[in-house]
Amino acid sequence: PEGKLEFPEADLLGLNMEGPFISPVKKGAQDEKNIVPCNVEIAKRFLKASEGLVKFIGIAPAESSEAVAFIQEMKDSVDISLAHTNADYDTAMAAFAAGANHAVHLYNAMPAFTHRAPGVIGAVADSRHVMVELICDNVHIHPAVVRATFAMMGADRMVLISDSMRATGMPDGTYTLGGLDVSVNGNRATLVDGGALAGSVTNLMDCMRTVVKVMKIPLETAVACATANPARCLGVYDTYGSISEGKKADIVLLDEDLELKMVIKDGQLPFL
């Protein structure tokens, strides 16, 4: 694109739509006035406007009787995820059977997993084709739950995400997210009105480091969940996600404490 930097800091591989087709009950830090039931025509407008850059569309299947039809209509054009949903086990299983293949920040903005009501989490466990996002900032999920999820569902399905918002890397204070005021205190971001978690203020490198040091997941597993697994989700593993001949030379070098030492971008050394 015009104005491209000589050393761009990152490649934009796609956009993830976590709305507007979500549940008002599980809206998290989203403005309820923007929420609508899943709608094929609206989704197609987003895809057209983004020129194909939208790669994931999240839906709350319990909020619309047309959810299965929506998935069947859209699944060949975009990946469908379950996001900010109040669905029960059967509703989630029907969505996954129809072609939904991704779970947005598992455990957050969905019903809790219990022995009589397994909900979305139980449906994800029973649907081996579904990839699983985890926010491993040591705020959103307890370390024991992270370990249990890896054991129950398998590391090959885990995708580490930051879920970070605009205040990431900024001092404590008040910021905005989608028009809503957010209070940032340390590594926690919450809505000023109501106190709900409002995304995170961490980054993916810190999440990977936390997975290893706090949650006790092996380093090689954590790295794959931050690199190879997301690349496979996006369908770009032939270019990204591992250090292999013929792939992009995008590499981060860490020391023995997992602190960043160097970034290599496109085979160049823009950041030392």
Give the label of every model feature segment.
Residues 1-6, 69-79, 218-219, 223:
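Short, electropositive alpha-helical surface patch
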Residues 1-53:
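Divalent-metal coordination cores built from histidine and acidic residues
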Residues 48-172:
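Active-site core of metal-dependent hydrolases
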Residues 122-134, 138, 150-162, 167-254:
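His/Asp/Glu-enriched, well-ordered alpha-helical/loop segment
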Residues 258-264:
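Short, Lys/Arg- and Gly-enriched loop/turn segments at beta-strand edges
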